């Protein structure tokens, strides 16, 4: 039993945010090697697939495609109806057959961003309200 909801698809455009990784100019030797290994892991595809199963995107989606089933790719990136039940990153059912992602395909969603933020002023408030919503959804 869950709460029925629908995400807003504002006519004016989405507000999006981006988090990135970078290296300190002071990193050297084994620390620098470990930092590059970590960055490369993020770009390897598997982390992006895990993120996709939570509804998020990664900067190099093509690398994630090999780690998603064709049904997952079609739902999360192509904007098509789910042709099978899809699991979330926790392995539990998340998307029902026939469900369509609000906002369309990756290209449609990315093409409709009006404002980019790094961290919104409302972030802490929204995280608390999202937690409230998720707790209500599970009862």
Predicted segment positions?
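Conserved C-terminal helix/tail region of periplasmic/extracytoplasmic solute-binding proteins
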Residues: 89-139
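Mature extracytoplasmic/periplasmic domains
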Residues: 21-101
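Active-site lining segments that contact anionic ligands and/or coordinate catalytic metals
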Residues: 4, 18, 33
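Sec/Tat-exported extracytoplasmic proteins
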Residues: 1, 42-46, 55, 130, ...
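Ligand-binding pocket segment of bilobal, Venus flytrap-like solute-binding proteins
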Residues: 1-10
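Short, surface-exposed loop/turn microsegments at beta-strand edges and helix-strand junctions
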Residues: 11-16
């Amino acid at each position: 039993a869950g709460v029925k909801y629908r995400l807003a698809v504002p006519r004016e455009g989405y507000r999006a945010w981006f988090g990135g990784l970078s290296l300190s100019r002071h990193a050297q030797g084994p620390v620098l090697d470990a930092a590059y290994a970590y960055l490369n892991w993020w770009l390897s595809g598997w982390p992006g697939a895990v993120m996709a199963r939570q509804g998020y995107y990664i900067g190099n989606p093509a690398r994630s495609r090999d780690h998603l089933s064709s049904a997952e790719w079609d739902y999360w990136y192509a904007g098509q109806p789910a042709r099978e039940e899809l699991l979330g990153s926790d392995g539990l059912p998340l998307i029902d057959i026939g469900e369509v992602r609000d906002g369309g395909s990756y290209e449609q969603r990315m093409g409709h961003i009006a404002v980019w933020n790094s961290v919104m002023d409302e972030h802490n408030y929204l995280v608390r309200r999202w937690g409230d919503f998720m707790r209500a959804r599970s009862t």
